[in-house]
């Protein structure tokens, strides 16, 4: 792991505290650094991320991943709860790996359809000694129809996966009633805001809140959309592999 080209992540203790009302432990900071090193090295073989500079990596991967669960971080009561989490389309492991690192009581499932990326993440789990995470190589449309996974999870995480309505169709079938899906977004379009409530209702959910915020270093606008599962998702959702993305529910409404 000694690579002279790999730099050290910035400390940022005060920024963690000011923005998330939370700070990582010394051990967690060490895990963040090792995760950074593993991803930079893995990037030489796999197309994991274009974000490689330490400050950018801290802001756009570490901080951004944890901003979505700020409501958990700032209330220690949640830390000891045993929750089941699924990171849908985990890619290089964000935000799911971060959740597994800082919330060891949570059982985190990292889902991706690309076997090479899942193999890489499995090596990370071993190298970082993360015991509370497992991986699945599959399409979300397929596992969303399986009894083993459907209505199983307390929290669904979706970051840089698809449009909001597609993410809703991916996530809500997997959530227990009372569960929450967290959609990590940049800007939200007017069309998304107009169409999402009806689509979410169809899938057994409701929009609990939308949080707009700026990132602490680059002042980029970001949004997190929180969808609460309030009723059963109709059995015909999610639709077959590829269909949610090719024919989003919002477009079907207009036909």
From Swiss-Prot:
Keyword Transferase applies: yes
GO CC, alphabetical: cytosol
Record keywords: Cytoplasm, Methyltransferase, rRNA processing, S-adenosyl-L-methionine, Transferase
Primary localisation category: cytoplasm
UniProt cross-references to InterPro entries, sorted A to Z: rRNA_ssu_MeTfrase_G (IPR003682), SAM-dependent_MTases_sf (IPR029063)
Signal peptide residue numbers: none
Cellular localization per UniProt: Cytoplasm
Binding positions for S-adenosyl-L-methionine per the UniProt entry: 89, 94, 112-114, 140-141, 159
EC number: 2.1.1.-
SUPFAM superfamilies per record: S-adenosyl-L-methionine-dependent methyltransferases
Main enzyme class: transferase
Pfam families: GidB
GO molecular function: rRNA (guanine-N7-)-methyltransferase activity
HAMAP family: 16SrRNA_methyltr_G
PANTHER family: S-ADENOSYL-L-METHIONINE-DEPENDENT METHYLTRANSFERASES SUPERFAMILY PROTEIN
Reported function: Specifically methylates the N7 position of a guanine in 16S rRNA.
Stated family: Belongs to the methyltransferase superfamily. RNA methyltransferase RsmG family.
NCBIfam families: rsmG_gidB (TIGR00138)
Listed name of the protein: Ribosomal RNA small subunit methyltransferase G
Origin species: Trichodesmium erythraeum (strain IMS101)
Lineage: Bacteria, Bacillati, Cyanobacteriota, Cyanophyceae, Oscillatoriophycideae
Gene name, Swiss-Prot/TrEMBL: rsmG
